[in-house]
Amino acid sequence: MPRAWLLNPPVFCIQIHMSSTKSRLTVPKFQAMKVEEHKITMLTAYDYPTAELLDQAGVEGILVGDTVSEVVQGHANTLPVTLDEIIYHAEMVGRAVQQALVVVDMPFPSNHLGVTRAIESAGRILKETRCQAVKLEGGAEQAEVIAGLVGAGIPVMAHVGLRPQSVHRLGGYKVQRDEQQLLADATAAEAAGAFAVVLECIPASIADKITRTIEVPTIGIGAGVNCDGQILVVNDLLGISGGYVPRFVKKYADLRTTISGAVTQFRNEVREGTFPADEQTFK
């Protein structure tokens, strides 16, 4: 390094140092947002550039979701994605994020094979990525697994209500309305040590009651406005997803149309001989 840089480092050098030393949001700080009544924003990400953009935009949490099975791999549901594949995507996301809390889904059936196997799977996720926590689907029936993971030092976000990994048992993606069971699942997850609970596709009134009952943050997806935070699949939010989009999704952009238009324009210009033009050509 030139000696002059030690006294007057270039701007790019300062920026690289600062970006590499920013502290990530921690699990305790994430939990404190409920007490502070600070609404939590979360989105999914599956690759480096998307995760980097979401992090720079200031979301508090990023989930490497098993929805990668649907929106990236093209499967009909979340079941096919494997642990190795989740880790592959989580490693990219973990490398990109400097500020947000990064959570990784435990893919089916990694949390249904006993506590020891669950710890092995979740341990791999944390060891092989720069991510900080795992999410698993389940409430009361997963309490032992949640407690085992937490006891091993692995932060757990629980997921109750509609559980996409149980799509075949449920007979489809249906709103879950059993208030007693939903409340029991959320409280059991909290008691087992979960630091937050995702509430998916449940009536807003039930989500509100759960949010007021448990002390850890609730993250809603199709669960009304009174949850402590909200999460969406980023492909849905950006309007990239094709076909059916759930009712609870709001499209904040229409990138599917934008991308299609850009590619069509490129194709036409190549065929017409107008690309590359002089400004894209070396002399």
Regions found by a protein language model. Give the residues of each.
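Alpha/beta enzyme core
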Residues: 25-33, 40-75, 79, 83-104, ...
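N-terminal mitochondrial targeting presequences
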Residues: 16-19
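C-terminal helix-cap and adjacent tail motif
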Residues: 247, 251-253
